[in-house]
Regions:
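Nucleotide/pyrophosphate-binding catalytic subdomain
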Residues: 2-235
Length: 235
């Protein structure tokens, strides 16, 4: 058997973790390549056109909290989504209790904590499903007071986890501020998280997966059979 020391950081977006079937596809992708050892995930996205992204529901949950509106129906949608994934995959971790504790303590949480929980819970389920360690972004990604990345601190913490674990799953989208509080990137920031891991761990390749192969000239949910873009420049 050929031994390779190549290191890949592999990021899966929201549509790629939308349900249990998508989790199964990810496991197959990971098993096809032993260099895919460090995985970054987004929060579950839409399963179908009229569906809700978990992060959108979390922002709605925060708005209900802010304006003192009953949020139980919104929370139920969020909770059921994660429980459905857990049950369909036969996972064992008591995520129901952690979800309930999250809702119970909602009024004590900042918006950043609330909206980052989609990635957090998704990464915990993915870690169990793959048999990988779960590494929480809040313990690793560090921001400076000006909200830029503290590269020295972040790199040191990532290198320590790299030395500790051969494989781990990492939630995208958030880290910890200079004041010790959860801080999030702009929407779509899970891609930034993946790039940070790739830079700090000196990865050979950074893969960013979606549920659509390649680059298309139009949104396939709007335009039927759009043509692909075979060559594209970074600039």
């Amino acid at each position: 058997m050929e031994v390779t020391h190549m290191l890949k950081i592999t990021k899966f977006g929201g549509s790629s973790v939308a349900n249990a079937e998508q989790f199964k596809k990810i496991k197959n992708i990971i098993q096809q390549d032993p260099t895919r050892r460090y995985i970054v995930v987004s929060a579950p996205g839409k399963r179908f056109a009229a569906d809700n992204k978990i992060t959108d529901l979390l922002y709605l949950l925060d708005a209900h909290r802010k304006y003192h509106v009953d949020a139980s129906s919104v929370f139920k949608l969020i909770k059921n989504r994660f429980i459905e994934i857990k049950n369909e995959l036969g996972l064992k971790q008591p995520i129901e209790k952690e979800l309930d504790a999250f809702y119970t303590n909602l009024n004590q949480m900042s918006q950043a904590v609330i909206v980052s929980r989609g990635e957090y819970f998704c990464a915990k389920l993915m870690a169990e499903y793959l048999g990988y360690a779960f590494v929480d972004a809040k313990d690793i990604i560090r921001f400076k007071l000006d909200k830029s990345i503290d590269w020295d601190a972040t790199s040191a913490k990532l290198q320590a986890k790299y030395a500790q674990y051969d494989h781990f799953v990492f939630p995208g989208f958030y880290g910890t501020s200079a004041n010790g509080h959860i801080q999030v990137f702009p929407r779509g920031g899970g891609d930034i998280t993946g790039a940070i891991l790739a830079k700090c761990l000196h990865a050979d390749v950074y893969e960013n997966w979606t549920d659509v192969s390649g680059f298309l000239m139009a949104d396939p949910t709007i335009v039927k059979n759009p043509k692909g873009i075979t060559h594209i420049t970074y600039s």
